[in-house]
Amino acid sequence: MRLLMLLSVLEVCWAQYNPHTRYGQTSIVHLFEWRWDDIALECERYLAPNGFGGVQVSPPTENAVINNPQRPWWERYQPISYKICSRSGNEHEFREMVKRCNSVGVNIYVDAVVNHMCGKDVSAGISSTCGSYYNPGLRDFPAVPYSGWDFNDGKCKSRSGEIESYNDIYQVIDLGHEPIKSSEYFGNGRVTEFKYGTKLGTVLRKWNGEKMAYLKNWGEGWSFMPSDRALVFVDNHNNQRGHAAGGPSILTFWDARLYKMAVGFMLAHPYGFPRVMSSFKWPRYFENGKDINDWVGPPNDNGVIKRVTTINTDSTCGNGWVCEHRWHQIRNMVIFRNVVNGQGFTNWWDNGSNQVAFGRGNRGFIVFNNDDWALSSNLQTGLPAGTYCDVISGDKNDDHCTGSEIYVGSDGRAHFSISNTAEDPFIAIHVDAKL
């Protein structure tokens, strides 16, 4: 009885690190600023069939309506109550989304804002997504209800006791030189590893003398948190706009060629639990090195979010939505990760520069060329003999491949050729893409 009780306690203590996706699903996607009804439809028509395990949704709670600037993306992070009522939809639509997504095996993960309420610079009134009254200056949020007695000024080590100036407070994004460490949050669950996208972007941009060859010990070897504690990502809604952590090294959809390589590497490598970004476009305009339009909100008609209903013939999105998760290279790497789940990191190869390759046991193999010259090498894949479809250049349709084919010999070796001018200078093969 004591042994069983101890095992039960240990199981509960470790449960917070399990993302609880369905068996065999190994990644999630952030559908940033999507409507609840569009997310429900996307779960059914695309995410579930392609092996995505879950969706991170934008904050669902009632927020202040900001009109200067006009309806920015960050108004979602100015809560005035915990009513499920935002420009993504109401509580009924949220419930239906969860029900429909769960019914096809896709989980919903909420970006919950619990650290703060709407800032005091926002005027009092009922200009909110659900019409509730609020007075930030008096810290009066009766729809919660919160009053000034519910706030903790003394615990904020800043000049004002509040967080309107980020220069006043400790940065909780741990880039390795902050007084607050990511390990302090391990008790709550997996923690976002911001160093991941920052470092990977620096390597792929070849800044500061970095090379892909140095990625052989990627993960804890780069002073990241333990793999089973980490939620990893190339970019997020914040740092793709130059905010928060990362700076100019962060790769985004604006850098499509390198971005696809970065996401491909993330999904092929066993470190951490990955989150794919799905964005919307905005009219970037730089003055003195700063994008003065970084506030722009999602595609909308008079404040109402546009439906993600324009799906192009290549399955990508229109109507102002980028939908990186629908790029076939990224979709196929989500599938790749599912196929190689549980396999080790094997058969590393590099040329000492920016041509690298590695396998995932006997289930998958990937090759990158980020050099300024062509790659042509015979490499040990660890895969069974046969002909494989490269899932970056195409898809396996029945017994045919719409892209390049790779032949693996009886010794597990295969020849790979990748031009340095290729639109997608990487190749990925796995056992489910065997012809």
Map each language-model feature to its residues.
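Classical eukaryotic N-terminal signal peptides for Sec-dependent ER targeting/secretion
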Residues: M1-S8
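Active-site-proximal N-terminal segment of extracellular/periplasmic enzymes that hydrolyze or transfer
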Residues: W34, N50, D121
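Glycine-rich FAD cofactor-binding loop and adjacent beta-loop-alpha segment at the N-terminus
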Residues: P79-C85
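Acidic-and-aromatic substrate-binding clefts and catalytic sites of carbohydrate-active enzymes
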Residues: F32-L41, N63, R87-N90
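Active-site-proximal helices and loops of the catalytic beta/alpha 8
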Residues: L10, W14-S27, E42-A48, F52, ...
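Short, intrinsically disordered, charge-balanced linker/junction segments flanking boundaries
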Residues: M97, K155-P179
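Aromatic- and acidic-residue-enriched segments that line the glycan-binding/catalytic groove
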Residues: V65-Q78, N115-E164
